Amino acid sequence: MPALCATYLIHSGNLRACLRIVPLTKPSVVIAYRHLSKSSSKIAPAAALNTAPIEFTPNTSAASLHERSTVIKDAARSALRCNDTTPTPALPFDVKRVDKANRAAGRKLPAASGVLSAYALMGPYIQLAKPRLTVLVMLSAICSYALSPYPATVLELLSLTVGTTLCSAAANGINMGREPDFDRQMMRTQARPVVRGLVTPMQAYKFSAVSGVIGTAILYAGVNPTVALLGASNIVLYSWFYTSLKRKHIINTWFGAITGAIPPLMGWAAASPLTHPGCWCLAGLLYAWQFPHFNTLSHNIRNEYKNAGHVMTAWKNPKLNARVALRYSLLMFPLCFGLSYYGITDWTYQIDSALVNGWMSFWAFKFWWQQRYNYSKKVYNNKAEFNKGMVLANVYARKTFWVSVLHLPAVLILAIVHKKGRWDWLFSDEGKLVA
């Protein structure tokens, strides 16, 4: 707004009023002001600046006035363009022009000088914990705790949540620290922090040690020793046995499935004894789910596993890989029925869970049937027909994988909804108004 007013006054000829509006922080304006003051002292007595029209004396020629006016206008226009760098003793600092490039570089100075944000410091360690997998492990423990027939407490729930999360983070951190050379060879794992050099293997081990000790201590103090022992054993099973067997034998998948079955046992043991058969149905559910989920995932990246040196069923025995995925998909039916049979859920859970289990079993069956056809003698020796069949097998494997991602939370949520006794109040006569 001041710039617009000054421009108007320049063109209208009221230069002194213009110099009152334009701030005296630009050297060119200071020069213009001094020039005007010297010229005015020869024409009339000194007076304060005001907005009145300039009175010209008779002895001032038109050429002289025009020359002074041109100098002042040029100085004012230069100031309004904000690109004058002329030094002046009237200012306590040098005026320097700053372009957009310097401003952009200035914004990046804190990062360039080594000052990192909290996310830049903590981000690699959060990735070490495999947050999505850790959340799934933590939720499976919480769901099992919620399904327990015994009463729950807030302290136990918080301790179980934090302790299970830290134990899972510890196991995943050790796993990444042991396999950077192998993870570097797979597209799926190339972005891991140890592979990218954001964290060294030793830093990953230290992170895992701190997480594991704190997590186990929280489970011991806030829940009970049984849950703490299960949490510590899960760290050892995943980071040592499973990780070591990945490069030796296909049985590694079965060991990995055990680590997925332990969190439900931890949740159940937080409030109830492990002698109840219902908790083993929950553990079996998580154990069986690992196979259709992982076998179909590994099928589509089987060549990467092979090149990285991981011994997986997907490339060692493709027919067995598909058969195992179907076998454990079908095992979901009796396990869910067992939850109703042993009084964990009501009888309607058998219907709901059968629909969800049937959805995954359908795609697992198509995957197995296609692989069985692809590796038959007639098709396997025909390269064109085999390649055509593998395209379909890849599609069915991908379908089964994504169905499994939705299947597990659906089955667990339905179990909580159908927990035994949850809806008894709706059908009871307690609290009924008496006429």
Swiss-Prot record:
Report the GO molecular function annotations: protoheme IX farnesyltransferase activity
Q: Which InterPro entries match?
A: Protohaem_IX_farnesylTrfase (IPR006369), Protohaem_IX_farnesylTrfase_mt (IPR016315), UbiA_prenyltransferase (IPR000537), UbiA_prenylTrfase_CS (IPR030470), UbiA_sf (IPR044878)
Which GO terms fall under biological process for this protein? Answer: heme A biosynthetic process
Biological function: Converts protoheme IX and farnesyl diphosphate to heme O.
Its EC number is: 2.5.1.-
Enzyme class, first EC level, given as a word: transferase
Supply the gene name: COX10
Q: Which family does it belong to?
A: Belongs to the UbiA prenyltransferase family.
Please report a single Pfam family linked to this protein: UbiA
> How is the protein disposed in the membrane?
Multi-pass membrane protein
Q: What GO CC annotations are associated with the protein?
A: mitochondrial membrane; mitochondrion
Q: Where are the membrane-spanning stretches?
A: 135-155, 157-177, 212-232, 250-270, 324-344, 401-421
Alphabetized, the UniProt keywords read: Heme biosynthesis, Membrane, Mitochondrion, Transferase, Transit peptide, Transmembrane, Transmembrane helix
CDD domains according to UniProt: PT_UbiA_Cox10 (cd13957)
Q: Does the keyword Transmembrane apply?
A: yes
Q: What domain of life does the native source organism fall in?
A: Eukaryota
Q: Which organism is it from?
A: Eremothecium gossypii (strain ATCC 10895 / CBS 109.51 / FGSC 9923 / NRRL Y-1056) (Yeast)
Q: What is this protein called?
A: Protoheme IX farnesyltransferase, mitochondrial
Subcellular localization: Mitochondrion membrane
Quote the transit peptide annotation as a residue range.
1-35
